[in-house]
Regions:
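Acidic-enriched, low-complexity/disordered segments with a strong bias for Aspartate over Glutamate
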Residues: 10, 31, 42, 54-55, ...
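Trp- and acidic/polar-enriched beta-sheet ligand-binding modules for extracellular glycan
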Residues: 64-68, 79, 90-153
């Protein structure tokens, strides 16, 4: 007989998923990273550090006609990187059409991801790479890209 309640196995699985999400995305390693961009300032003279704030009130917007952007993160020492979270400032529309993620290993750059759209939120599995440098390279966008958040966990 059905009770209209969620089965206890499903409840346990949902709690486990909630704990995984909470623990995995608790501490953003970007908070302790140096962050630079090419171009170095956005069209409103804002520093790239605004990308640490996870909201739509702060964003980094390229000059009109500049459809490429590189976001560089560097740490003092190597970190184990599991996930990268990217967000576009959706109030300005989804703009990114092609991007890649690269990291430094033994003095050379290696590509660990390439994709098309970012949109509201893109979560990328970095598979636990060990590095002190990560670059997000927006290679093409419909119009100047507007990024609102970068997180590394």
């Amino acid at each position: 007989m059905k009770s209209g309640r969620i089965h206890e196995t499903d409840v346990a699985n949902l709690k486990q998923l909630g704990e995984f999400i909470e623990n995995t995305f608790k501490y953003n390693l970007v908070d302790e990273a140096g962050i630079t961009t090419i171009p170095p300032l956005d069209c409103q003279e804002k520093e790239p550090t605004v990308l640490r704030t996870d909201d739509y009130e702060t964003y980094f917007m390229n000059e009109a006609g500049t459809n490429k952007l590189m976001i560089k993160l560097n740490w003092v020492e190597k970190k184990k990187l599991n996930y990268l979270v990217l967000k576009e400032a959706i109030p300005f529309s989804q703009r990114v059409e092609k991007f890649k993620v690269c990291y430094e290993e033994n003095g050379s750059m290696k590509e660990c991801y390439n994709g098309t759209t970012i949109g509201y939120k893109k979560i990328i599995d970095l598979k636990g790479i060990q590095t002190d440098f990560l670059a997000i390279v927006i290679e093409d966008s419909r119009v100047a890209p507007v990024m609102s958040f970068v997180g590394v966990y």
